[in-house]
Amino acid sequence: MAQFPLFQKFQKAIQHPPALSLGLPIFLTVIFLLSQRYVWIEDDLELRSTALTNFELNRISFYPLVHATWFHLLLNLVALQPIVSQFERVNGTVRTGIVLNILAVVTAIPWCLLSIGFFPDEAVLGSSAWIFSFMGYWAIRESSKQPTTQLAPNLVVPTWLLPIIYLVVIAIVIPSSSFIGHLLGLIAGWMMALGYLDVLIEPSSKVVLWIENKISRVIDLIPSSIVTFYREEGALDTRAAARADTNRSLSVSGGNFLGFQANSSQADLEAGTRSRGNSSVDPTTSFPGTGQTLGTQ
């Protein structure tokens, strides 16, 4: 029986989804259900202006885990899962978890500083900042190949600015949403794509491998037919090749966004060139990665 190409792609995508991208929606849903029963969960995790001055690390790190309503949760899950999944296939499962935490903190700190002076009584929660961070990240990545995008016959905009449109639309459609929080999340994603967060999101592979070793028993408990765990060893080549492709394209275009230069080095380019020669994966297309299916060695 003939199948439509779109259906085939969808069918392939759901056969072995990345481990974190599958587990995160489940985990967020469980947290939401618990928070409806135990209201202290939301009270303890929502981000407030005092989180920084009181050194409340639980709020600074975990505010994306709690949501106000079912609609809030479902809207974020639908938008978050595919973009995190694509990132995980390139960068590995454990490293993606590290990136999620770093993005939450990088967004929270400036929000707290601004809120002290401008909106001290506000509190924010939810994973929408993650969504805008990854939208910003992928917009920069895409702009290295397609600098501009035509939205209408007489309207052409820089590709890296496309998330701004979503930012404005969300602010209009959902006025109760945190425009500043979304904007700071978007800026964090731009910074990550340009390499300015590498010192935070690029821990040594030895650290990631150590974490993978510690959770290996948990990984093996999940049937291999359900998800794919993208191990650090397999992600090294795809990550280096993807970084090199972006840096090379940004170098050709000048790599300048709002006056900021892409933070790349010749070593990145050379490493990516070597990796691409050893990898059968084309990171500029499907970002499939070199995953380790759960339950296997």
Swiss-Prot record:
Subcellular location: Golgi apparatus membrane; Golgi apparatus, cis-Golgi network membrane
One GO MF term attached to the UniProt entry: serine-type endopeptidase activity
Positions with biased composition (Polar residues): 275-297
Pfam families named in the record: Rhomboid
EC identifiers of the protein: 3.4.21.105
Ranges for region Disordered: 268-297
An annotated GO BP: proteolysis
Active site: S128, H182
Signal peptide region: none
Domain of life: Eukaryota
Keyword presence, Transmembrane: yes
Broad EC category: hydrolase
Keywords per UniProt: Golgi apparatus, Hydrolase, Membrane, Protease, Serine protease, Transmembrane, Transmembrane helix
UniProt family annotation: Belongs to the peptidase S54 family.
Name of the protein this chain belongs to: Rhomboid-type serine protease 2
